[in-house]
Amino acid sequence: MPEIRVTPLGAGQDVGRSCILVSIAGKNVMLDCGMHMGFNDDRRFPDFSYITQNGRLTDFLDCVIISHFHLDHCGALPYFSEMVGYDGPIYMTHPTQAICPILLEDYRKIAVDKKGEANFFTSQMIKDCMKKVVAVHLHQTVQVDDELEIKAYYAGHVLGAAMFQIKVGSESVVYTGDYNMTPDRHLGAAWIDKCRPNLLITESTYATTIRDSKRCRERDFLKKVHETVERGGKVLIPVFALGRAQELCILLETFWERMNLKVPIYFSTGLTEKANHYYKLFIPWTNQKIRKTFVQRNMFEFKHIKAFDRAFADNPGPMVVFATPGMLHAGQSLQIFRKWAGNEKNMVIMPGYCVQGTVGHKILSGQRKLEMEGRQVLEVKMQVEYMSFSAHADAKGIMQLVGQAEPESVLLVHGEAKKMEFLKQKIEQELRVSCYMPANGETVTLPTSPSIPVGISLGLLKREMAQGLLPEAKKPRLLHGTLIMKDSNFRLVSSEQALKELGLAEHQLRFTCRVHLHDTRKEQETALRVYSHLKSILKDHCVQHLPDGSVTVESILIQAAAPSEDPGTKVLLVSWTYQDEELGSFLTSLLKKGLPQAPS
């Protein structure tokens, strides 16, 4: 029996190093190839030895798909392709292709140049890896080979993020990557059609969360920032370079303008310019409001937000700083945090999810004494706030997407086990869909049924059986019945019943051909000549001369008309249905040869 096999190499009951191996109808696809931000050893990368035991990666894998540019989804890609060894195609969207190498290089600099880590990929490896990338457009069906095809859908989340449908014959899997079902200030909501895959693999980061009103969260965020700077404190907002950063910058920019505030706002050097460049380049990926106003005003060119210099961190007085990365695991955000953590007037606002092992996760879990590098202990006196501006779907959004796609089964990844368990039960009870949540290295096998049960109406069955007993008709019947699909159930009914159920009127499509004849007689006389001629030739057909002057041969209609510009010429209009195309073509050819001379 056909089956789909899924093995998470990363993100199984876990957030970080997303990497899911899918086998579908004899094809093997790797979905994402991320790194875990909470580890600095071999655990940061997925365990690729699971694949390589039986030979070369390229021989086993048909393709790799990257859903978006976040490092927990693409961070291990150069290691995988250049160090482990994979030469096959890597698919991603155009914005992901543009932004991915920049973030990989930024992270490489932190890991190798600053921390001196060994066994890490080089700048050249990033370039060589990106040469294997095939960029895809949204809703474009891409043939990976003769049997395997993939298609990208808009996922929201970050610029260029996509959900992917993987299809082989009648079997299909949809992988969501990270997505957001709520539009925000710069991106639209995720969308997928009713594609009814055998399996939907969905993220479950916020599996138990139902978010409050976005407007309340924004108001709360602005209030906390404003109160902190009013009392002379500094606000650190750790973000990733693209995504929540732009969302919160637009929010603060508007508030600063409205309140006429003079407190400086800074953003990590260089990244603002890069972000601006890519949002301009890929403006079709943003939401409708930004696309409409972009010609008059670029929402990403900020009047109040300036580039940050590391010397500014020691300046007296209030300020707001957006610094990367978003989980306080390295880089500029961690450096600033260490400087400001000891002052209770200051505040750090964590706007997104932090994986276990990162400083961000530790302070959100309540730790206030942190062991840093070199066994230094950092005491955190600054206020710590968590405000979810995360661009992940909440429980309501995940349920909405499952309902939209109508899969046969659901598999949860990219989430914590306890939260997954809650969502698994919710999906199974409310949507009556089987749901799985494998751990890393655990394989889920799903049998797929290539047959679809179809109900048939008794009336149609009786009619077809009676038709089968009759001698073969001259003309083949083009339509025996109509397949109706409703609520995932299929029924075969007669075409008359289908029209009645759907409230549709029957239409007939006819083809008309013009035949020119030289004839000075009146139209009625020409039609009579046509009737006599055809009656004498077509002994086995029903030829009739109707009261209105037209001629019929079976269902074929022939009418004579006189063009006003040439009274000596008559035009015969020969029309037929698709069913009688053969007879219609024959009559047209016959009439084009002309009519026999009538006795004078």
Swiss-Prot record:
Residues annotated for Zn(2+) 2 binding in this entry: 72-73, 178, 414
Keywords: Cytoplasm, Hydrolase, Isopeptide bond, Metal-binding, Nucleus, Ubl conjugation, Zinc
Cellular component aspect of the GO annotation: cytoplasm; INTAC complex; integrator complex; nucleus
Binding site for Zn(2+) 1: 68, 70, 157, 178
Keyword Zinc: yes
Subcellular localization(s) per the UniProt record: Nucleus; Cytoplasm
PTM section of the record: Sumoylated; sumoylation regulates its subcellular location and is required for integrator complex integrity.
Single Gene Ontology MF annotation: RNA endonuclease activity
Motif (Nuclear localization signal): 469-479
Regulation: The RNA endonuclease activity is inhibited by BRAT1 that forms hyrogen bond and hydrophobic interactions with the active site.
Cofactor(s) the protein requires to work: Zn(2+)
Record cross-link Glycyl lysine isopeptide (Lys-Gly) (interchain with G-Cter in SUMO), residues: 381, 462, 475
Active site per UniProt: 203
Chief location category: nucleus
Oligomer status and interactors: Component of the Integrator complex, composed of core subunits INTS1, INTS2, INTS3, INTS4, INTS5, INTS6, INTS7, INTS8, INTS9/RC74, INTS10, INTS11/CPSF3L, INTS12, INTS13, INTS14 and INTS15. The core complex associates with protein phosphatase 2A subunits PPP2CA and PPP2R1A, to form the Integrator-PP2A (INTAC) complex. INTS11 is part of the RNA endonuclease subcomplex, composed of INTS4, INTS9, INTS11 and inositol hexakisphosphate (InsP6). Interacts with WDR73; interaction is required for the assembly of the RNA endonuclease subcomplex in the cytoplasm.
Family per similarity comment: Belongs to the metallo-beta-lactamase superfamily. RNA-metabolizing metallo-beta-lactamase-like family. INTS11 subfamily.
Known function: RNA endonuclease component of the integrator complex, a multiprotein complex that terminates RNA polymerase II (Pol II) transcription in the promoter-proximal region of genes.
This protein's name: Integrator complex subunit 11
Organism this protein belongs to: Pongo abelii (Sumatran orangutan)
